[in-house]
Amino acid sequence: QPRSRGLGDVYKRQLIDKVSGRIEYGDGLKDYEIGYLPQQTVVQKDFPATVWEVVLSGTLAGSGFKPFYGKKEKSLAIEKMRELDITDLKKKCYRNLSGGQQQRVLLARALCATSKVILLDEPVTGLDPKVTAEFYEILKKLNDKGITVIMVSHDLQSVSYATHILYLDSKDSFYGTKKEFMQSDKANVFGQMEGDEE
């Protein structure tokens, strides 16, 4: 039985659909140039594939209609696994990994699809605070390398890592820099937070 969706869920879905290419947009970015890390469901967490198979599948967007993975795709998958320090997990079954390891695998998969933009939907849901902080540090390093990171999150800690914030609720919205957000009345929703400098 489908659950009712609040206005926040509707806003989130529209944003993700727009950015991930399900709705047409005209900024010159192609849908295959966006790496997407969806919010995981119980079924996805129990996916019976190896880490290698999951990461390698991220290269499909750029491989056209080739029926097999070539050297280029395999090299890219290896590079992204090294970048996220998951090469030792290559032969392990995805469903046997911890939540943090699964998110690293999915991020490596998303990065195989793009070097421009990654879109993440609630990527730290269910992760413990230490793993969450490590995941945010990985995202910061990717952003420092020039990859645009767009993240939908209810996690307050994510504000510390943001450069710009789009805040939506049923009555109001805000878009601006982190500094502008922290100086606005919207920041009161979050209470006192650290890392409010740009």
Q: At which residue positions do the language-model features occur?
A:
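H-loop (His-switch) and adjacent beta-strand-loop-beta switch element
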Residues: 162-177
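H-loop/switch region of ABC-family ATPase nucleotide-binding domains
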Residues: 153-154
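Catalytic Walker B motif of ABC-type/P-loop ATPase nucleotide-binding domains
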Residues: 118-122
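Single conserved hydrophobic/aromatic residue that forms the stacking wall/gate
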Residues: 1-11
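Conserved ABC ATPase "signature" region
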Residues: 71-89
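Conserved ABC ATPase signature
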Residues: 93-97, 101
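Helix N-cap at the start of a conserved alpha-helix in ABC-type nucleotide-binding domains
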Residues: 129-131
